[in-house]
Amino acid sequence: MATFDDVKAVVVEQLSIDADAVKMESKIIEDLGADSLDVVELIMALEEKFEIEIPDSDAEKLIKIEDVVNYIDNLKK
């Protein structure tokens, strides 16, 4: 769950939302209220935090927080 906690912290900071709103099943746009610019900034912040690169083709598949956590965990293997 360490990855989730780190992702959650980035999401809370980038979207200026309450931490309680961020759950594994939360959809970034529909549930957390992100717009397309928010998503771009969120991806950039995640890349910086985790020292990874997320190609646009992968970024568009990251719909839920769970998708982001699993993606990052798979890169770290």
From Swiss-Prot:
Record's keyword terms, sorted: Cytoplasm, Fatty acid biosynthesis, Fatty acid metabolism, Lipid biosynthesis, Lipid metabolism, Phosphopantetheine, Phosphoprotein
Q: Which residues carry this modification: O-(pantetheine 4'-phosphoryl)serine?
A: 36
PTM per Swiss-Prot/TrEMBL: 4'-phosphopantetheine is transferred from CoA to a specific serine of apo-ACP by AcpS. This modification is essential for activity because fatty acids are bound in thioester linkage to the sulfhydryl of the prosthetic group.
An example GO biological process term is: lipid A biosynthetic process
Cell compartment(s), UniProt: Cytoplasm
Q: Which SUPFAM superfamilies match?
A: ACP-like (SSF47336)
The Carrier domain, residue ranges? 1-76
GO function terms (MF aspect) = acyl binding; acyl carrier activity
**Which Pfam families does the entry mention?**
PP-binding (PF00550)
Q: Which family does it belong to?
A: Belongs to the acyl carrier protein (ACP) family.
Task: Tell me which NCBIfam families the record gives.
Answer: acyl_carrier (TIGR00517), PRK00982.1-2 (NF002148), PRK00982.1-4 (NF002150)
Role: Carrier of the growing fatty acid chain in fatty acid biosynthesis.
| Name used for this protein in its record | Acyl carrier protein
Q: Which organism is it from?
A: Campylobacter jejuni (strain RM1221)
**Lineage of source species:** Bacteria, Pseudomonadati, Campylobacterota, Epsilonproteobacteria, Campylobacterales
